[in-house]
Amino acid sequence: MMEFGLSWVFLVAIFKGVQCEVQLVESGEGLVQPGGSLRLSCAASGFTFSSYAMHWVRQAPGKGLEYVSAISSNGGSTYYADSVKGRFTISRDNSKNTLYLQMGSLRAEDMAVYYCAR
């Protein structure tokens, strides 16, 4: 299995009331029927996006964080949790500093808040 360093940076990181320079802003919220599909995007700024592996995690209502997927800095290597393998596809566009998660064959248990992380 690949080794991905993960420093939990979600959305706009706030530390001791001071806004950090690193920003990860997700988009792609939607109401989807079971079996449907949805693409999430994460626009990154404040760091050299192409130098970092990137990650998706999620949190279902009333539950803890669940690791979903990761992609290496150049996009050549990917990892998926067993729960999403074969249904979700992670990708990135380093020229746009953007991370994506294409989600397909959606199930009720996929309902969650999704976060991108560096």
Curated annotation (Swiss-Prot):
The protein's name in its UniProt record: Immunoglobulin heavy variable 3-64
UniProt-listed Pfam families: V-set (PF07686)
Record's keyword terms, sorted: Adaptive immunity, Cell membrane, Disulfide bond, Immunity, Immunoglobulin, Immunoglobulin domain, Membrane, Secreted, Signal
Record domain Ig-like: where: 21-118
Region of interest (Framework-2), ranges: 54-70
Signal sequence, renumbered to the chain: 1-20
Taxonomic superkingdom: Eukaryota
GO BP annotation list: immunoglobulin mediated immune response
Subunit note: Immunoglobulins are composed of two identical heavy chains and two identical light chains; disulfide-linked.
